[in-house]
UniProtKB/Swiss-Prot annotation:
InterPro entries to which the protein is assigned, alphabetical: Fmt (IPR005794), Formyl_trans_C (IPR005793), Formyl_trans_C_sf (IPR037022), Formyl_transf_N (IPR002376), Formyl_transf_N_sf (IPR036477), Formyl_transferase-like_C_sf (IPR011034), GART_AS (IPR001555), Met-tRNA-FMT_C (IPR044135)
Keyword Transferase: yes
Positions that bind (6S)-5,6,7,8-tetrahydrofolate: 110-113
Organism: Streptococcus pyogenes serotype M3 (strain ATCC BAA-595 / MGAS315)
Name of the top EC class for this enzyme: transferase
Entry GO terms, CC: cytosol
Keywords noted in UniProt: Protein biosynthesis, Transferase
The protein's name in its UniProt record: Methionyl-tRNA formyltransferase
SUPFAM superfamilies, per the entry: FMT C-terminal domain-like, Formyltransferase
Catalytic reaction list: L-methionyl-tRNA(fMet) + (6R)-10-formyltetrahydrofolate = N-formyl-L-methionyl-tRNA(fMet) + (6S)-5,6,7,8-tetrahydrofolate + H(+)
Superkingdom as given in the UniProt entry: Bacteria
Chain segments annotated as transmembrane: none
Amino acid sequence: MIKLLFMGTPQFSATVLKGLLDNPAYEILGVVTQPDRAVGRKKDIKVTPVKQLALEHGISIYQPEKLSGSQELIEIMGLGADGIITAAFGQFLPTILLDSVSFAINVHASLLPKYRGGAPIHYAIMNGDKEAGVTIMEMIKEMDAGDMVAKASTPILETDNVGTLFEKLAIIGRDLLLDSLPAYLSGELKPIPQDHSQATFSPNISPEQEKLDWTMFNQEVFNHIRGMNPWPVAHTFLEGQRLKIYEAQLAEGEGLPGQVIVKTKKSLVIATGQGALSLIVVQPAGKPKMSIIDFLNGIGRKLEVGDIIGR
């Protein structure tokens, strides 16, 4: 039985971890995940999906704010793991830790060398890519630059957003890891170096990127909304208040960027740099997420054709 240390945080990671837990060839000695966070207006404490799964299986849990130089680092190095598996962990691994095990493998949600970094799925959708994928790669000190063990891809549909694509890629990543790991560990599967000259990067989404630019073409704004749903969520401004936009549809029409060009009891169409978008699901400041119909019956009832949002 191969003894593993698992490191990850979101549901993507938990899906991969569950695959390893269900496989009798592997024993998970411990998991390392991000610390619990206070979320929402009530500041409720939320544990990570990886921690929740580890609790259910009685696995030792380590949650350092920063792994390097921590007491937790000393403890996990003493577990005697054969190898490390990471998936969307969110921290760099110290070289001393990588050197302490026989192998260290990362499950990365992009077709490397494209989209190294923390937000590959967001950028794949925002950039209008036709496919996304997962790469199983060896871990080295440089971010997502290790040799590639295996790859798998899937189409990005017009109906996909970050949430749906995360779910698809988590399953693909789980299966790809379980399929390729035995051959990799036996030496039958030889890793392939990345072409570093082709590397692109997907840094974590900044607050500035969440704001919609209505001067962009409608397809670009549409992709941007999908690439922010369900987190961190794209927004615009209405009378100085933030209006989050979760869903929209491509529409026809002309007008100034951000201008209301159609308003009925059931629809609100906003002009972009070319074409337009029909808003479907929004969230006004201080309110719950709602359909555009509910919005137009409430806060949005004051909007008129010709008004401009986003200022």
